[in-house]
């Protein structure tokens, strides 16, 4: 009976500690029964992986992790390995989401067994506290905040840390959750500068300084959230009226649909008052591209079903094919009025009756359709490039050979 050395092979097997009656508690090499041995790469339930085996065999019961053997300490949450820890032992841990979410100490969550990693150390969860160390408590970080915050360094900081609002008004310094200056006394009912607004205009009176009717979605998507939902008498970014100066009485809120306002290329001037021309309800394709000769034909050409549905000028939305819409180039000529039907941008617009039957006779007796077979009739709308079998009459099979 001999103690294991660096060579642990025994007929391509490695002996386990005494797992049967014939094996003792010590590791055996010479007289170990095959029932006590396994292949060189043991299962985790049998022994530690090969990189963790030391020169003197150690029972697997003393190995608490597949990362490091018992000689590779200290504990998992400490800063590093001991001097005897080899790089092969310092592997990354398989971080679990549950660990990262539920750990009370996220800075040291999900670290490898013997090494330290930053795989689960969000930047925004580092407390940013004031000089008073007594207030430096753990922040109640929310996952969504840490993920979506544009400034993760100051995301979800404790209450004792510096709030987002400036120090002009102490009443504004609420909890620094960056959520709502609207609900706080930032925007007073009086016309004076506040932390959430650079200031009202000079002609602003206290009676007009009411809360704006801005929707929360507007405040969320605004590029300048601090000045989003400000009093009505002040200038806003997301709901700026674009009214004509000569007619201020008609400057009411436009009936623009939210979808229109969302998809508008110029959101700042989207939902403008009724007295002004809305930008969002003027599609690019609605500009008529018609000849000036026919006024009945010169109507709007939207070429989009959505425009035709939502446009306030539906009578001129989908124009006939005598005009040239950008996306619906007509296939009919202007000479034939019967051909000027509603354009559906499909070959079905033109019938095959426009094509003249073939009068050519094939010398080789082949019923082929040559390009000359489908010469369009004057004012016919069939493309010259399409040669369909219905246009051609079968060859009479008269052969000179």
From Swiss-Prot:
Distribution of this protein across tissues and organs: Restricted to hair root, not detected in any other tissues.
Residues making up the signal peptide according to the UniProt record: none
Stretches forming Sequence repeats: 36-40, 41-45, 46-50, 67-71, 89-93, 99-103, 109-113, 114-118, 119-123, 124-128, 129-133, 135-139, 145-149, 155-159, 160-164, 172-176, 186-190, 208-212, 218-222, 228-232, 233-237, 238-242, 250-254, 270-274, 275-279, 280-284, 297-301, 307-311, 317-321, 322-326, 339-343, 349-353, 354-358, 373-377, 391-395
Keywords: Keratin, Repeat
Span list, region 36 X 5 AA repeats of C-C-X(3): 36-395
One Pfam match: Keratin_B2_2
One cellular-component annotation, GO: keratin filament
InterPro entries hit by this protein: KAP (IPR002494)
Highest taxon of source: Eukaryota
Keyword Aminoacyl-tRNA synthetase among UniProt keywords: no
Role noted for this protein: In the hair cortex, hair keratin intermediate filaments are embedded in an interfilamentous matrix, consisting of hair keratin-associated proteins (KRTAP), which are essential for the formation of a rigid and resistant hair shaft through their extensive disulfide bond cross-linking with abundant cysteine residues of hair keratins. The matrix proteins include the high-sulfur and high-glycine-tyrosine keratins.
Complex and partners: Interacts with hair keratins.
Family, similarity comment: Belongs to the KRTAP type 10 family.
Protein name per its UniProtKB record: Keratin-associated protein 10-4
Organismal lineage: Eukaryota, Metazoa, Chordata, Craniata, Vertebrata
């Amino acid at each position: 009976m001999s103690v294991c050395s660096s060579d642990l092979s025994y007929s391509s097997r490695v002996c386990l500690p005494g797992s049967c009656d014939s094996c003792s508690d010590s590791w055996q090499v010479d007289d170990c029964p095959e029932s006590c041995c396994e292949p060189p790469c043991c299962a985790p339930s049998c022994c530690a992986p090969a990189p963790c085996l030391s020169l003197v065999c150690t029972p697997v019961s003393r190995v608490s992790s597949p990362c490091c053997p018992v000689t590779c300490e200290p504990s998992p949450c400490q800063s590093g390995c001991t001097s005897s820890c080899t790089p092969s032992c310092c592997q990354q841990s398989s971080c679990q989401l549950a660990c990262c979410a539920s750990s009370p100490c996220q800075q040291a969550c999900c670290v490898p067994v013997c090494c330290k990693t930053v795989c689960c150390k969000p930047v925004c969860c580092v407390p940013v506290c004031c000089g008073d160390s007594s207030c430096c408590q753990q922040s109640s970080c929310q996952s969504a905040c840490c993920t979506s915050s544009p400034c993760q360094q100051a995301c979800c900081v404790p209450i004792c840390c510096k709030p987002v609002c400036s120090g002009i008004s102490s009443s504004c310094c609420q909890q620094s959750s960056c959520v709502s200056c609207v609900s706080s006394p930032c925007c007073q009912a009086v016309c004076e500068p506040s932390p959430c607004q650079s200031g009202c205009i000079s002609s602003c009176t206290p009676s007009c300084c009411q809360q704006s009717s801005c929707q929360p979605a507007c405040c969320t998507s605004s590029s300048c959230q601090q000045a989003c939902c400000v009093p009505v008498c002040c200038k806003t970014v997301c709901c700026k009226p674009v009214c004509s100066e000569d007619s201020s009485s008609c400057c009411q809120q436009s009936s623009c649909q939210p979808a229109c306002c969302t998809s508008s290329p110029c959101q700042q001037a989207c939902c403008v008052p009724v007295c002004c021309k809305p930008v969002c309800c003027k599609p690019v394709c609605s500009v008529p591209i018609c000849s000036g000769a026919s006024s009945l034909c010169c109507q709007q050409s939207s070429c989009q079903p959505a425009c035709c549905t939502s446009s306030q000028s539906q009578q001129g939305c989908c124009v006939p094919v005598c005009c040239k819409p950008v996306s619906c180039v007509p296939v009919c000529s202007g000479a034939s009025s019967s051909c000027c039907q509603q354009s559906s941008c499909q070959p079905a617009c033109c019938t095959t009756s426009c094509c003249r039957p073939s009068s050519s006779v094939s010398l080789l007796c082949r019923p082929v359709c040559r390009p000359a077979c489908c010469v369009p009739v004057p004012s016919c709308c069939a493309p010259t490039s399409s040669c369909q079998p219905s246009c051609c009459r079968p060859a009479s099979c008269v052969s000179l050979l």
